[in-house]
């Protein structure tokens, strides 16, 4: 009894007018978010048996205040400091105490006190009614975290498995869409495309499910005291890797933390918030080599969603676990969203630009497409990824995409029986594919722009309508291969073996085919303008209606080739061998035929206007008339048959006889 009297004597009184003024100023302070008004300070004030129904004392200083027997029903005491306050026999029906500091306070005998109103409070050394004091918070936390722990470890294990698969993924398996997990019995159950597009979606859904469970857990924890009577905290009753996420949001835990607690918080945050975005980033990075725009954009979207969750969820958790804080002054919604999502927007834009730059751009290596400078904008994305030591284009050097022939039968029949790989419409831009094996491969409409396939084996491969712009196919074996309607501008096929290949309707403008073997090839209506065919073997090839303007066919072998209706305007044919070739209605306007051998060639109706026949051997040519030679103006030093020479001199009125060569002895 003496203790109660002394406590009452220590408290100071306050008039009703002063109390009303304090409450009014405090209300303004709360409503303005602390920008105006005065925060109430009623420390040590005697308010015993006062009628304080519905008052708003949120965040007020009420240390050692005497509320014994007072009516505080429906009052707002959120976040108030009530250290050693006397609340005995007070009416606390509907009173909001969330976030209040009740350390050492006396609430014994208080009426209407409910544990659900004590969320985030500090109850250390407080005296509570028996019904409230017996509440077991440890059991509630253990039950709430059980399922969350299972999902947490499922995410970690899934990300670990995915990281291992990504680390062991080769470009060959990625291109072939082979099994992502090759040791499974059903080897085709999880193809690469399914794994790289399905696994990220699964991880994101699992990640979001986990954090929705955590939000429910944080909500349950927010309904519990932050500090119990014995000084324990809820985090001690749950696993550290989950509780550490909420530690910095609890008012009574974040003020004094040990280095170990800081390390736990950082590690827990990295694992819970950033393990999924980082894993999705590696999915995106590894999948770039497949050059699949749709799949890559899906990765960018999933990464953006995960980054948005990782950056926004801590703010949501803070609002859930700190209910005693003052409400912030309302702001325009767009700036708030922009501030919260700025990391997400920046990462999404960066990944999109890198993806577009890789799939539509070119490698950082200046030796590829040397006509483009090293600072060209199309190289920026590859140069950016090169800083982390990653080349975003496939490297399948010396790989075998098609199986070898059965029983080691390398005869023509055995090679023709090989079942080639199906890679129709595959994107292999700027891939490194030196000495690869593509026999009978299906590459319809494949994109091989800038690809390096030197010495590759493409026998019987189908590259119909393929894009081969600037590709390097020197010394390839491509007998019987199909290049119909392919876009092979500026391709390098020097020294290639294209015996019996079909290049009809192909665009080989500015291509390099020097020393290539095109014996018996079908090249109907091919576009070879400005192409280099130095010493190329075109014997028995079909080049009807071909476009060969300004092409170089010096020293080329054109024996028995069919150039009917071909356009050879301005073509360099010096030293070429036309023996027994067919050139019906061909256009040789301004062509250079110096030293060419046209013995036995069929030249009926061919146009030789402005052609240079100096040193050319036209003896035995079929269908060649004096009118054709007169049109050239450069026939005088050509080797002609005697009758053709006389007819030409008579028609052209030559002032100088044509060179007929040595007379054969009789």
Predicted regions and their residues:
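Hydrophobic alpha-helical membrane-embedded segments
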Residues: 158-162, 195-223
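Charge-rich cytosolic interhelical loops and cytosolic tails of multi-pass membrane proteins
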Residues: 217-265
């Amino acid at each position: 009894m003496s203790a109660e009297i002394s406590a009452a004597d220590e408290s100071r009184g306050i008039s009703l007018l002063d109390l009303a003024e304090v409450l009014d100023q405090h209300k303004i302070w709360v409503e303005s978010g602390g920008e105006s008004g005065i925060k109430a300070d009623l420390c040590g004030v005697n308010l015993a048996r006062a009628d304080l129904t519905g008052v708003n004392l949120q965040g007020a200083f009420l240390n050692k205040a005497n509320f014994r027997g007072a009516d505080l029903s429906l009052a707002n005491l959120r976040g108030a400091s009530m250290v050693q306050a006397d609340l005995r026999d007070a009416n606390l029906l509907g009173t909001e105490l969330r976030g209040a500091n009740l350390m050492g306070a006396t609430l014994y005998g208080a009426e209407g006190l409910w544990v659900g109103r004590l969320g985030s409070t500090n109850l250390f050394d407080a005296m509570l009614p028996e019904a409230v004091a017996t509440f077991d918070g440890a059991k509630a936390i253990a039950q709430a975290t059980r399922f969350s722990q299972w999902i947490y470890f499922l995410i970690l294990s899934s990300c670990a498995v995915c990281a291992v698969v990504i680390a062991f993924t080769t470009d060959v398996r990625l291109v072939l869409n082979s099994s992502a997990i090759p040791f499974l019995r059903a080897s085709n159950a999880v193809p690469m495309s399914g794994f790289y597009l399905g696994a990220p979606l699964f991880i994101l859904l699992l990640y979001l499910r986990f954090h929705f469970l955590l939000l429910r857990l944080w909500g349950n924890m927010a309904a519990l005291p932050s500090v119990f009577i014995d000084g324990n905290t809820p985090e001690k009753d749950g696993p550290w890797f989950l509780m550490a996420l909420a530690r910095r949001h609890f008012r009574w835990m974040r003020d004094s933390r040990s280095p170990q607690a800081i390390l736990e918080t950082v590690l827990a945050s990295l694992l819970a918030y950033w393990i999924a975005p980082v894993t999705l980033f590696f999915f995106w990075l590894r999948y770039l080599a497949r050059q699949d725009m749709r799949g890559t954009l899906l990765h960018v979207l999933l990464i953006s969603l995960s980054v948005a969750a990782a950056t926004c969820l801590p703010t949501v958790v803070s609002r859930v676990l700190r209910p005693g804080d003052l409400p912030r002054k309302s702001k325009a919604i767009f700036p708030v969203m922009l501030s919260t999502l700025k990391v997400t927007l920046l990462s999404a834009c960066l990944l999109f630009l890198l993806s577009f730059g890789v799939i539509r751009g070119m490698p950082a290596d200046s030796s590829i497409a040397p006509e483009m400078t090293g600072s060209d904008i199309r190289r920026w994305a590859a140069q950016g990824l090169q800083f982390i030591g990653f080349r975003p284009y496939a490297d399948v050097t010396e790989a075998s995409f098609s199986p070898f022939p059965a029983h080691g039968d390398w005869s023509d029949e055995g090679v023709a029986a090989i079942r080639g790989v199906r890679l129709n419409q595959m994107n292999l831009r700027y891939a490194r594919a030196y000495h690869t094996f593509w026999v009978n491969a299906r590459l319809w409409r494949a994109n091989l722009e800038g690809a390096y396939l030197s010495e590759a084996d493409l026998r019987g491969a189908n590259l119909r309508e393929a894009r081969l712009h600037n590709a390097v196919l020197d010394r390839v074996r491509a007998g019987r291969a199909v290049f119909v309607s392919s876009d092979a501008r500026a391709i390098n096929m020097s020294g290639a073996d294209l015996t019996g290949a079909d290049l009809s309707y192909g665009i080989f403008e500015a291509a390099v085919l020097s020393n290539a073997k095109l014996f018996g090839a079908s090249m109907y209506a091919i576009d070879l303008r400005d192409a280099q065919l130095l010493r190329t073997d075109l014997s028995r090839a079909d080049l009807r209606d071909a476009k060969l303007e300004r092409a170089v066919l010096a020293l080329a072998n054109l024996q028995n080739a069919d150039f009917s209706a071909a356009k050879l305007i301005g073509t360099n044919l010096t030293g070429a061998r036309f023996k027994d070739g067919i050139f019906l209605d061909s256009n040789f306007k301004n062509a250079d035929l110096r030293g060419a051998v046209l013995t036995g060639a069929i030249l009926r109706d061919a146009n030789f206007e402005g052609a240079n026949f100096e040193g050319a051997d036209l003896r035995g040519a079929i269908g060649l008339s004096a009118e054709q030679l007169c049109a050239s103006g450069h026939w005088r030093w050509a080797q002609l048959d005697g009758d053709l020479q006389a007819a030409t001199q008579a028609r052209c009125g030559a002032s100088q006889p044509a060179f007929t060569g040595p007379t054969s002895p009789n």
